[in-house]
Regions:
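Acyl-donor (CoA/ACP) binding surface of acyl/acetyltransferases
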Residues: 1-35, 54, 67, 71-185
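Hydrophobic residues in alpha-helical segments
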Residues: 29, 38, 60-61
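Active-site rim helix/loop that mediates acceptor-substrate recognition in acyltransferases
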Residues: 42-63
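A short gly/proline-enriched turn/hairpin at secondary-structure junctions
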Residues: 35-43
């Protein structure tokens, strides 16, 4: 990939995350409801948001991850991020991750964004497998993945530390051939 790929849906723009997004990222990453299943603590300072943006930018430049900002077309408001991490060009796989501001939950934005990046991952990035690691207690995230065709593969015990407590996760996966044949697209 050369320049950052900007994608669109009917309601959303998926775009690069810029330094100017730090305040908005801080707003929702400082909210415990957003981070309680994220495997990290809620932000306490704006610098943490700036560091995360820098991590996304460096990760993209080094082909280790790609993270899009999720922006509402109607208002140009950044409401979340989504993307792929644990990228392996050699093995043609990645893991998907996403979060949406609590102010925009239950509106279908996560599903809309993930569907779009899955298409991009399988078609443009030529992935053959996309996984998702989800805390066992994170039912909302599992409800996003299931309708898109992700299959639960099994539990990974004590895989993530959340609030200094080892937590179990469920590994999900979606294969390219399943995506191509599915009605989820």
């Amino acid at each position: 990939m050369t320049s950052f790929p900007h994608l669109e849906t009917d309601r959303l723009k998926l775009r690069s995350i810029e330094n100017s997004d730090a305040v908005k990222l801080f707003e929702y990453f400082s909210n415990r409801e957003v981070t309680k299943y994220y495997g990290m603590d809620s932000f306490k300072t704006l610098e943490e948001a700036e560091t995360l943006i820098h991590t996304f930018q460096i990760g993209y430049q080094s082909n280790k991850l790609i993270r899009w900002g999720i922006e509402l077309k109607e208002t140009n408001e950044l409401i979340g991020t989504c993307g792929f991490h644990a990228l392996s060009q050699k093995y043609k796989r990645a893991e998907v991750g996403y979060e949406i501001s609590h102010l925009h939950w239950k509106k279908g934005y996560a599903t809309e964004a993930i569907k779009t990046i899955l298409d991009f991952g399988f078609e443009e990035m030529e992935m053959i497998r996309i996984g998702a690691v989800v805390l066992l207690a994170n039912s909302p995230s599992r409800r996003v993945l299931a309708p898109l065709g992700f299959k639960e593969e099994g539990m990974l015990r004590n895989y993530i530390i959340q609030d200094n407590i080892p937590c179990d996760v469920i590994m999900h996966s979606l294969l390219k051939e399943e995506w191509i044949k599915s009605s989820y697209r």
